[in-house]
């Protein structure tokens, strides 16, 4: 059984998928901010474009949708498991991933603050939703689960680090809680890799990317 801390008392966000991209509205207010994934996704990614060109649009779409489906189911399992629910059955194609992720959860999560955590920053004018705020070996941390078709290199996931840095900053702004580390357990058919970083190392780059987004897309935010 996982220990759960008292609720963080965060405001709820309403997700809206617009033609211009995803935004979050702060329930009970007039505030609407672009999602952090939208902000970071605005920068061109030549390696993805090259991959899509190499395999073809149809195959790229098939691979992406299959990976997204597995990722959603794996995340749902983790959420239920950390919520101390019984997992009656696990689909075979997800079980091969779950058998890698579950031991890591058991070994390192020592307390749960919140799951599916709605976060926004008035200072940065961005919003988002992270998977988990938890104690990792006793250290308050942001945790965002990822699924991949094959193992990743740190150089491939720099935007994940910026995403996690935003979550840590927004959590501090909303609650005063400091998470000095962000973890990304990335599970593939070959195992679970856990990438760890410190938000302080990515603050300047995150600000630059947000400023770049607003300079280019301010009129299309909402």
Model feature map: region roles:
Residues 1-127:
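Metal-dependent nuclease catalytic cores that hydrolyze phosphodiester bonds in DNA/RNA
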């Amino acid at each position: 059984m996982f220990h759960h801390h008292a609720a963080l008392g965060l405001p709820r966000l309403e997700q809206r998928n617009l033609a211009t991209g995803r935004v979050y509205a702060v329930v009970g207010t007039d505030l609407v901010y672009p999602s952090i994934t939208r902000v970071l996704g605005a920068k061109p990614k030549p390696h993805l474009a090259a991959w899509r060109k190499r395999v073809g649009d149809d195959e790229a779409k098939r691979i992406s949708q299959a990976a997204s489906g597995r990722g959603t189911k794996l995340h749902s399992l983790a959420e239920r498991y950390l919520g101390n629910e019984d997992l009656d059955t696990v689909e075979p194609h997800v079980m091969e991933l779950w058998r890698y992720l579950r031991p890591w959860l058991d070994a390192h999560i020592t307390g749960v603050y919140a799951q599916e955590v709605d976060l926004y920053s008035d200072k940065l004018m961005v919003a988002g939703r992270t998977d988990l705020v938890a104690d990792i070996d006793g250290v308050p941390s942001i945790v965002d689960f990822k699924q991949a078709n094959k193992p990743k290199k740190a150089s491939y996931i720099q935007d994940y680090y910026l995403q996690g840095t935003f979550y840590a900053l927004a959590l501090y702004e909303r609650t005063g809680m400091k998470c000095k580390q962000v973890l990304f357990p990335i599970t593939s058919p070959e195992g679970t890799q856990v990438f760890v970083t410190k938000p302080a190392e990515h603050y300047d780059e995150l600000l630059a990317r947000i400023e770049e987004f607003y300079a280019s897309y301010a009129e299309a935010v909402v």
